[in-house]
Amino acid sequence: MENTPFQFTLSQQRALEQLNEFVTSASSKVFILKGYAGTGKTTLVREIIRLLKEKELSIILMASTGRAAKILSNITRHAATTVHSAIYEYKDFNQNLEEIAKERQKFKMDKSGQLYLQFELSSLPESDKQHFYIIDEASMVGNEKDKSATQAFFGSGQLLDDLLHYDPKGKFLFVGDICQLPPVNEEISPALSEDYFRNRFDVLAKCAELTEIVRQDDTNDIIIASHKIRKLYANPPKTKWGKFPLRSCRNIKIFNDQASMLNNYVNRLKTDGYNKSTLICRTNKSCDAITSLIRPALGLTQPKMQKGDLLLITQNNLISGLMNGDLVEVVSVGTQKFRANLSFVHVEIKELFTQKVYSQLMIEEILYNNQTNLTQEQQKELFIDYYIRMRERGIRQKDFLFKEKMRTDIYLNALRVVFGFALTCHKSQGGEWEHVYLDIPRSFPLNPTKETYQWLYTAMTRAKTQLYISEGFWLE
């Protein structure tokens, strides 16, 4: 460690020493590296990768979302993928499509229930080396079954279970911030909990926590204020109305009202483009309402998508490689096509992070009906339509070509998007922007709980340079 170019904090040095012991220990399987905003988790991950490479160990870098994986790859200069794409592979549909098609044709009805893709744990490639897995943004790695899934089911449905079972001999380093929001519909972040590993897996997880703000962030008032919010999260005061210590901060601008804040956001989008700023809302409904104000202010006056619109990808896309959470700008809008009771439109889009342009179909119903994805019924119609098209070409469900063509079918792989001018906090997780605007509803501070402060902490730490909020009695 003497030759490293970094000046580590005391907690970083201690964590590195513990990690070195973990790497060489034959019995240790899981290490949890916790750290709040600005404590240098990413710097430490880079150093860990360097040390592991020196030891010629097999490193597999993962993140909980596609956006987080891209950011991680860029920062560490080491290839990263999502946990899902690393450990699962497509197996088959959960039902026989031919039987469903016959029933529909014979009885003019369908009682077969939900139709979805089944993904199973993929086989680990044979190797003499022990694999070392680093999972970033691990606060979003859940272990509850997703009951709202409409298109695909993965393994046992419990991601953390499956990850550990994927490589029983592997070592796992989970990196994250326990103050960030946990996975949707879960009360804690299981991958960052020593108690969870002990109770669920009988695994004694090693743990280190970064507590000191690193030198380059100790003058950033967003980081300093976020640590005050973190303390409120750790010990929520019993009060009817929460108070947020966000006043008198150089990096936090307070507007007189929401309208002034939105006007500033619109002007910044016009001046700087879409890459540097975002607006975070409490609910999807609030996102929709604010989007209806922002689009006309930007000159996007058509009710339907047009050139210059900002979109958020809501599902990983096999054709383009675009990931759930990626933001794209519409370059052009082409012709419509209709299949499976759905409307598709050809679009050219530019991914903000890489500026790369993609050309493919997009499903309109999701964008215009305030959905984030297709319903079970819509998804089923799309699957059956694909089956019929393949059957007409003599390709059956169990054929190798059936599976292969699924990966490139333009309708199955049409983009699923929503407008991206305003994001929920969960959708923003794993991302960061120079400028972040927060829409805090008046009812938000009422009877505050740990989740109240957790949401605010997660949202405000998406901002690197400047945070914007509107005036409220809850500010102090």
Question: Can you describe what each PLM-predicted range is?
Answer:
Residues 1-18:
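N-terminal pre-Walker A segment at the start of P-loop NTPase domains
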Residues 1-4, 38, 472:
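ASCE RecA-like P-loop NTPase motor cores
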Residues 8, 61-62, 279:
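Conserved SAM-binding loop
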Residues 12, 65, 283, 430:
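Short, conserved phosphate/pyrophosphate- and ester-handling motifs at nucleotide-, phospho-/glycolipid
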Residues 15-19, 27, 158-170, 178-378:
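Conserved helicase motor core of P-loop NTPases
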Residues 16-17, 21-240:
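ASCE P-loop NTPase helicase motor core
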Residues 115-128, 254-263, 400-423:
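Alpha-helix-centered segments that form part of catalytic cores
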Residues 347-476:
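C-terminal accessory regions
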